[in-house]
């Protein structure tokens, strides 16, 4: 809605439409692509959610997949259920594309005026303030206050938690995953920019699809592929099985995170590269700069903000990622998310308060970093 043109409202007025009619007949239909993207994200997050539905003992496909593998050690059933969940996700995209029926949502960028803000007054102002305050209270103030109260009231749970180990494990995953994701994102984006190779472009486009898949499907698919590939090499060449190198290890976690969040990293770097005109590279080559020197002295400084933003977004995703970490983590390897889940699964809500609070604090630090430093740039 913010990026829509005021010209649309003026067209509605010229057609004799009231404010409400203009909104429902012009503004709302024009915002459909953004609304559909938002609804798709909500639908995918809901379908792939594990912690919430498991805590409330609601039987969903994600909990069934997890139980099939962890509780019954039945990888075949886990794969079959994963396929069903994947089918529903693909069905959402297909139905949305069919419903568009070739509709176009382009706007002429010339002469566009932003929609002016409306200063609310009286009852409207009170209602808007109360509504937003209730949302903020229910979603942040109340749960954080309750967790803080439990942490203070039950210090024995705090003393039983290895705080530094949880921090180091969480930050280790964040650092390694961010390093590999950002490095490969630079390699693919710079390769597409320099080589114009269609195969590399297609592979890059295909590789960003992992973010649309629920983490639990990726974890099960990862275990299935590694097990199959290891058994294949063992049967052909007589190699020792290397399953343990990838399954139940930090290496496996980082690879799974890479597949899951490469889209986030790739598109973040790509958006920065789209703002660097190709003529800048051509002028650098005319001045005798090599491709590496152009990359290191021009591209990297220009993309500094994008690198920081991508790193923070990856960190936010990884610290709260639960299904992948639960299934692929090493033995006795805990993060704040898995520790909070393990306590909640035992119905020890008071014990789960402290790791949950630490998770919120880390997320708040990352979000404040984005708002204060990156966005101000």
Locate the predicted segments by residue.
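Interhelical loop and adjacent transmembrane-helix boundary motif
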Residues: 50-90, 121, 150-161, 319, ...
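Periplasmic/extracellular loop-to-transmembrane helix junction in inner-membrane transport proteins
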Residues: 20, 24, 28, 67-75, ...
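Membrane-interfacial helix termini and adjacent extracytoplasmic/periplasmic loops
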Residues: 20-21, 53-59, 112-117, 159-164, ...
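Transmembrane alpha-helix signature in integral membrane proteins
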Residues: 85-89, 95-99, 161-194, 199-202, ...
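Loop-to-helix entry region at the N-terminal start of transmembrane alpha-helices
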Residues: 33-34, 127-132, 162-174, 212, ...
């Amino acid at each position: 809605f913010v990026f829509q043109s005021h010209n649309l409202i003026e067209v509605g007025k010229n057609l004799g439409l009231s404010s409400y009619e203009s909104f429902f007949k012009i503004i709302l239909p024009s915002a459909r692509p953004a609304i559909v993207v938002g609804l798709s994200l909500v639908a995918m997050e809901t379908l792939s959610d594990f912690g919430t539905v498991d805590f409330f003992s609601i039987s969903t496909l994600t909990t069934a997949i997890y139980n099939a593998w962890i509780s019954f050690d039945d990888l075949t059933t886990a794969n079959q259920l994963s396929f069903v969940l994947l089918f529903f996700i693909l069905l959402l995209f297909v139905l949305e594309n069919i419903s568009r029926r070739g509709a176009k949502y382009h706007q002429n960028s010339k002469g566009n005026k932003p929609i002016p803000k409306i200063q609310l007054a009286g009852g409207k102002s009170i209602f808007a303030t109360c509504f937003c305050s209730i949302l903020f209270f229910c979603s942040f103030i109340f749960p954080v206050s309750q967790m803080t109260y439990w942490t203070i009231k039950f210090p024995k749970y705090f003393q039983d938690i290895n705080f530094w180990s949880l921090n180091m494990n969480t930050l280790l995953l964040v650092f390694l995953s961010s390093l590999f994701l950002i490095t490969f994102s630079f390699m693919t984006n710079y390769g597409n920019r320099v080589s114009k190779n269609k195969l590399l472009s297609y592979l890059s486009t295909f590789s960003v699809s992992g973010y649309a898949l629920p983490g639990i499907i990726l974890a099960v698919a990862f275990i299935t592929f590694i097990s199959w590939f290891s058994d294949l090499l063992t049967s052909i060449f007589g190699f020792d099985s290397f399953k343990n190198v990838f399954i139940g290890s930090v290496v496996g976690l980082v690879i799974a995170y890479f597949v899951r969040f490469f889209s986030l990293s790739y598109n973040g770097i790509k958006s920065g590269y789209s703002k660097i005109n190709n003529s800048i590279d051509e002028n650098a080559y005319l001045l005798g700069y090599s491709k590496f020197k152009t990359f290191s002295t021009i591209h990297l400084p220009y993309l500094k903000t994008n690198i920081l933003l991508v790193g923070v977004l990856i960190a936010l995703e990884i610290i709260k990622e639960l299904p992948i970490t639960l299934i692929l983590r090493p033995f006795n390897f805990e993060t704040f998310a898995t520790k909070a889940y393990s306590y909640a699964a035992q119905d020890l809500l008071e014990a789960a308060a402290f790791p949950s609070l630490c998770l919120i604090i880390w997320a708040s630090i990352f979000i404040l970093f984005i708002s204060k430093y990156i966005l101000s740039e």
